[in-house]
């Protein structure tokens, strides 16, 4: 297991957020989601007991591989796994809202697991959750701007991660949220097919749709997005 703890003097909001994360994650039992086993408060201390993943996160992996990007087969496997995790979460009314390379774990057997549901919100009866801060460069416009979000926010973030995994570059990275928003609305300076002419056209089209600034233009579900990506990249 992995133990994450907070001692005396830790801001109450930090502990509250951690416990909210644990309660949310405990609802999600899935082979592609990092398991939270327990969460407790004892006096001035709070701790989470989580599954230990023996491996690397995607950011660490990209830093080690030649060229800083994944093969098509590796990317297909990653997206297939993450889509299953997210679809399960979405079906249970949970949004992730902070999908990024450091929250994607790959163990020594090649199993991909999504970690840190700290930004996750339980959706309302209408299926929507209030936007909360994720990570600049991976958040869609509606989340950056504090508007209502739904599953399509996670689709956008997943697409940003995939594009980065295929090219080694996050085209929406910015020093500020405003700078990142500008990149999103203007679109990537270098089209994907110019960065890698061998990328299947269907993958480029699916990414373009998923990265639309307008949520209604994106795919309707994370599984729909994965289906458009995995087969053209060569299945798993």
Model-derived features: positions:
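Activation-segment/catalytic-loop signature of the eukaryotic protein kinase fold
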Residues: 39
């Amino acid at each position: 297991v992995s133990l994450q703890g907070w001692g005396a003097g830790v801001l109450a909001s930090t502990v509250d957020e951690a416990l909210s994360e644990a309660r949310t994650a405990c609802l999600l039992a899935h082979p592609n989601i990092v398991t939270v086993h327990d969460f407790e408060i004892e006096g001035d201390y709070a701790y989470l007991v989580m599954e230990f993943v023996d491996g690397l996160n995607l950011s660490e992996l990209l830093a080690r591989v030649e060229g800083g990007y994944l093969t098509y087969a590796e990317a297909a496997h990653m997206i297939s796994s993450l889509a299953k995790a997210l679809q399960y979460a979405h079906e249970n009314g949970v949004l992730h809202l902070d999908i990024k390379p450091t929250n994607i774990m790959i163990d020594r057997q090649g199993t991909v697991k999504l970690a840190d549901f700290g930004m996750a919100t339980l959706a309302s009866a209408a299926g929507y959750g209030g936007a909360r801060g994720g990570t600049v460069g991976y958040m869609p416009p509606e989340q950056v701007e504090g508007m209502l979000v739904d599953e399509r926010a996670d689709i956008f973030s997943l697409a940003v991660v995939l594009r980065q995994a295929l090219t080694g570059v996050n085209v929406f990275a910015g020093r500020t949220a405003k700078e990142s928003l500008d990149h999103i609305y203007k679109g990537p300076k270098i089209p994907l097919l110019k960065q890698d002419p061998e990328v299947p056209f269907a993958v480029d089209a699916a990414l373009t749709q998923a990265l639309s600034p307008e949520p209604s233009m994106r795919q309707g579900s994370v599984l729909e997005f994965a289906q458009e990506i995995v087969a053209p990249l060569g299945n798993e």
